[in-house]
């Protein structure tokens, strides 16, 4: 049994006073001081971990004013603004109050198409804005690898930039106005002002008072600023004194806020300029035999007028080849006898197709000549059009996350990852950089914006090893020396954060002026203190080796507990699971709640914190209880559960709340670049949690469902009468379940027999073994799953009819529990027992050489996932479409004329963990003469039995409304098909529409042939 875990530290009296002041002044957002929220917000996309004292989630601009005023008379309250949490240098981490604006302040307020600008709240995600204005031919240009979760407020705070910055510049180049809140509670509106306009502002106005001081600081130090700020595409930001006066000589007050990392003000809104979206695009993937050749070639490539040039080394490329994204891009990286050690991605854009084709032809001819003459590059491929090009950029954007997935205790991490030097110096700079890393015998990955002189370098360190602190210091100091030598910067695009200790060195004699800017806005040093600058040159700044590392907490975890926590221990905080896109499957609970605890990153962080606290409590491994032990200890568990309901604290309860919200859809398992698999460690947690507390009745009902249904199928009218009666619904609701589905009304074994097919009984298998080779070659055994067999028996019959019409001789394997519901709810010992018995029966058929196929993707993929994770050896049970795609031959099929257009809504688990299997449906439909389009769609919100839980009903409904419902309700031209039983039942529940399985559609087509 696990022990009760006390809170690590109680909320301080000052934080309590702050909360009271907030509530007293009408704060509309949420306030959080719980351990779970603080643990989740203690990390970002960096190597550091700082637990905040509390978190607040403001709803609007007035809330920002309220919170700074509430903190005004509490000098111990420090404020740390947070956007998307994608910063790589702990910009949003701190021990005070985190202000997370992403939950509520995420609205696009206004878009002016004619004048090409948008007004947005600070929490708007960059890609979200672009998706809204794409059809108008516009886009917000600064591009980031984290663009699907990075907020525009965060981009402004770090003056972010990325791919394409040579053409489009940094974020500051697109900021027209900023509305922010100062620590005094004043609203600070910044824009470009002429000297006359600035002088005309009243002395009492915030803009006039601050603007005149900033102008004076700039003009008094103009020469020093010019000599200090290097002439780079990625200028020295935070604070950008050089651009206080713009090229026209006007005063640009935005320049100081851009790149200030929340140390001067809380950004509320921004007016930003939009660019015309090029209508024509092409991308060259240029291959090299060495990474240095790719770097050396960059200068020549830039002379051809490319929009952007990105580079990727072989380490990143090899990791991409193992990722699901590779299926979409592998055609552009054909295998070669030569070693591929680096690539340059060279993009050309235009508004005229003919002009672009001339550029493509000219550049392609140049590359052919280089390859023929034995130059730097040896091959290239071309992607045309936005769809193909975006697929390659998606692969490039996943590079940062993919590096974290290397199979080693030493992971490539960010701390010197955004150095910037003049592009002409890049190859020499990187050569010495690599020598430094090689000297320390470190592995590393490299990728980045070669056209801008910015390369992302991630040395591999084991952050649990105390030596890593020494290496972080040693390498950073040497890299600082190198950037100085090559006239560059340590911080090229990711901001300073904890690396601010080097600011005095880079600013030199200008540093006191930088401090004067800080003092003007935040004289008490309460806004993100320790970063960029203090109000005086003597104010201490954070140091890279004095801020706690994530690995320092991880090092406390015992080996056994680390194994139980699984992939939670490898999450690097990249935040890919925070994707705003409602049509992206990861992560549905985040999209519905906007609660960072309800994300793979949040759950991984909580699992790590949980096993750390268990280790601190001298727990060496998680308990493993049999069902019998769980039952006999139930009374004691019930007492502890009643104590829990009465308010007895246990950190495990907070972790349980986050785990209970997980749909176990496994999208994270397939889509996370690190392959963080929440369902796997969630099951481990639930198994251990219920060693101390009583399981709810719903878990027992769902866990035993595969045993209940075969019995209930013998009396379907009785069962259906109960679930449809008011008393039945009341009882189920009391147990925690809602909308229980009806049984089909006929036993699947009897239905198959009535249709003229056989059961794969031992006697029949013996008969098959002795049959002719021709007959034996047609055999296939359908493995049942409880949901299809008992809730959609007609679908099982359709499966047999389709197989029969296509020339196979199918038989039905006798029903045996698969165990998936047991695994989902953490009955791990029971699951292992069920799985082992089931596997034994599967092996009997497999050893005969007869293919095994399953229908429901979630249940069928369990054999290749959960079974193997649990150490159960199991034969290959194929998804039906994979079997058909492999077995059918076009010459043996007479295609039926296509009369319908079909759209396929694939199950989350299938789409994210077996994407090629989804494409198999297209192949099968095409062989039979039918058109099938795969729809890009999010999660339906049902996920097995998740949507049937009373506690999750509303969340399930929200998830359905976000992606599935609008597509289901609006698309009346095509016939929609869904592979998942849970998906089809969700559509029936909320849209009252019957959606078929692809097999049922094929059955109709073949019946008419």
Q: Which sequence ranges carry the predicted segments?
A:
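Terminal amphipathic helices with adjacent charged low-complexity linkers/tails
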Residues: 270-272, 304-410, 448-450, 592-593, ...
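N-terminal flexible segment immediately upstream of the FAD-binding catalytic core
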Residues: 1-72, 86-116, 145, 168, ...
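Ferredoxin-type iron-sulfur electron-transfer modules in oxidoreductases and energy-metabolism complexes
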Residues: 539-712, 832-840, 884, 924-931, ...
């Amino acid at each position: 049994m696990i022990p009760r875990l006390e809170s690590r530290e109680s909320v301080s009296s000052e934080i309590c006073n702050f909360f009271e002041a907030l509530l007293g002044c009408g704060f509309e957002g949420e306030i959080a001081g719980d351990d779970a929220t603080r643990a989740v917000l203690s990390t970002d996309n960096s190597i550091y971990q700082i637990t905040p004292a509390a978190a607040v989630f403001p709803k609007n601009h007035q809330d920002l004013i309220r919170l700074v005023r509430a903190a005004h008379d509490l000098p111990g309250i420090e404020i740390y603004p947070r956007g998307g949490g994608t910063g790589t240098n702990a910009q949003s981490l701190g021990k005070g109050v985190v202000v997370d604006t992403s939950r509520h302040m995420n609205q696009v307020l206004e878009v002016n198409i004619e004048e090409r600008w948008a007004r947005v709240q600070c929490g708007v995600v960059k890609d979200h804005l672009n998706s809204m204005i794409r059809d108008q031919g516009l886009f917000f240009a600064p591009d980031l690898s984290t663009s699907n979760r990075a907020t525009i407020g965060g981009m402004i705070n770090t003056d972010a930039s990325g791919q394409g910055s040579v053409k489009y510049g940094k974020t500051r180049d697109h900021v027209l106005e900023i509305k922010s809140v100062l620590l005094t509670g004043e609203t600070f509106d910044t824009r470009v002002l002429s000297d006359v306009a600035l002088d005309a502002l009243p002395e009492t106005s915030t803009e006039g008072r601050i603007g005149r001081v900033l102008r004076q600081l700039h003009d008094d130090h103009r020469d020093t600023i010019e000599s200090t700020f290097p002439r780079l595409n990625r200028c020295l930001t935070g604070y950008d004194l050089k651009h206080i006066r713009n090229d026209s000589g006007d005063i640009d007050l935005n320049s100081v806020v851009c790149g200030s990392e929340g140390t001067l003000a809380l950004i509320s809104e921004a007016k930003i300029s939009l660019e015309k979206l090029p209508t024509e695009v092409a991308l060259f993937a240029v291959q090299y035999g060495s990474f240095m050749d790719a770097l050396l070639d960059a200068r020549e490539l830039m002379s051809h007028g490319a929009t952007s040039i990105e580079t990727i080394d072989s380490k990143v490329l090899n990791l991409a080849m193992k990722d699901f994204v590779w299926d979409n891009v592998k055609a552009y990286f054909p295998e070669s006898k030569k070693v591929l050690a680096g690539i340059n991605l060279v993009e050309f854009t235009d508004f005229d197709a003919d002009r672009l084709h001339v550029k493509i032809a000219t550049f392609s001819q140049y590359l052919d000549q280089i390859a023929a003459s034995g130059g730097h590059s040896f091959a290239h491929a071309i992607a045309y059009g936005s769809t193909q090009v975006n697929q390659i950029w998606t692969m490039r954007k996943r590079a940062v996350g993919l590096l974290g997935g290397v199979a080693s205790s030493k992971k490539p991490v960010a701390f010197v990852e955004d150095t910037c030097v003049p592009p002409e110096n890049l190859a020499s700079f990187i050569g010495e950089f690599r020598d430094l890393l090689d000297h320390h015998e470190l592995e590393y990955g490299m990728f980045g914006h070669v056209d801008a002189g910015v390369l992302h370098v991630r040395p591999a360190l084991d952050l649990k090893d105390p030596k890593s602190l020494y290496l972080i210091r040693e390498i950073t100091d040497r890299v600082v020396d190198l950037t100085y030598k090559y006239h560059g910067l340590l911080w090229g695009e990711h901001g300073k954060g904890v690396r601010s200790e080097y600011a005095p060195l880079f600013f030199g004699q200008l540093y006191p002026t930088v401090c004067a800017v800080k003092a003007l806005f935040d004289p008490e040093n309460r806004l993100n203190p320790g970063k960029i600058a203090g109000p005086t040159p003597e104010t201490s700044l954070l140091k890279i080796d004095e801020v706690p590392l994530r690995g320092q907490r991880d090092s406390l975890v015992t080996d056994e507990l680390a194994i139980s926590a699984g992939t939670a221990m490898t999450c690097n905080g990249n935040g890919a699971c925070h994707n705003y896109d409602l049509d992206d499957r990861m992560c549905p609970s985040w999209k519905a709640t906007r609660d960072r605890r309800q994300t793979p990153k949040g759950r991984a962080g909580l699992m790590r914190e949980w096993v750390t606290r268990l280790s601190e409590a001298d727990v060496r491994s998680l308990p493993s209880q049999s069902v019998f032990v769980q039952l006999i200890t139930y009374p004691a568990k019930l007492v502890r559960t009643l104590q829990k309901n009465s308010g007895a604290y246990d950190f495990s309860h907070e972790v349980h709340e986050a785990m209970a919200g997980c749909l176990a859809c496994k999208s994270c398992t397939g889509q996370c670049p690190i392959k963080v698999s929440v369902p796997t460690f969630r099951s481990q947690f639930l198994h251990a949690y219920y060693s101390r507390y009583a399981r709810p009745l719903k878990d027992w009902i769902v866990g035993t469902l595969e045993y209940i249904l075969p019995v209930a199928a013998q009396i379907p009218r009785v069962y259906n009468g109960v679930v449809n009666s008011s008393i039945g619904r009341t009882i189920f609701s009391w147990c925690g379940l809602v909308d229980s589905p009806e049984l089909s009304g006929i036993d699947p074994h009897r239905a198959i027999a009535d249709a003229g097919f056989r059961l794969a009984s031992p006697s029949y298998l013996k008969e098959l073994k002795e049959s002719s080779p021709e007959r034996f070659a047609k055999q296939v055994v359908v493995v049942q799953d409880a949901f299809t067999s008992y809730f959609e028996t007609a679908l099982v019959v359709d499966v047999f009819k389709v197989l029969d019409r296509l020339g196979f001789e199918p038989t039905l394997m006798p029903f045996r529990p698969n165990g998936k519901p047991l695994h989902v709810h953490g009955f791990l010992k029971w699951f292992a027992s069920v799985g082992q018995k089931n596997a034994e029966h599967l092996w009997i058929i497999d050893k005969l050489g007869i293919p095994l196929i399953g229908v429901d993707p979630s249940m069928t993929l369990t054999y290749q996932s959960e079974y193997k994770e649990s150490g159960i050896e199991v034969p290959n049970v194929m998804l039906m479409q994979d079997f058909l795609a492999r077995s059918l031959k076009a010459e043996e099929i007479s295609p039926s004329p296509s009369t319908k257009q079909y759209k396929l809504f694939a199950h989350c688990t299938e789409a994210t963990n077996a994407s090629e299997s989804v494409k198999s449906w297209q192949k099968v439909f095409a062989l039979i003469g039918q058109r099938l389009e795969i729809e890009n769609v999010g999660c339906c919100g049902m996920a097995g039995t998740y949507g049937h839980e009373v506690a999750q009903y509303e969340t399930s409904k929200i998830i359905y409304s976000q992606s599935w419902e609008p597509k289901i309700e609006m698309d009346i031209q095509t016939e929609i098909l869904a592979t998942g039983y849970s998906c089809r039942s969700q559509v029936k529940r909320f849209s009252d529409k019957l959606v078929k399985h692809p097999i049922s559609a094929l059955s109709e087509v073949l019946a008419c042939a």
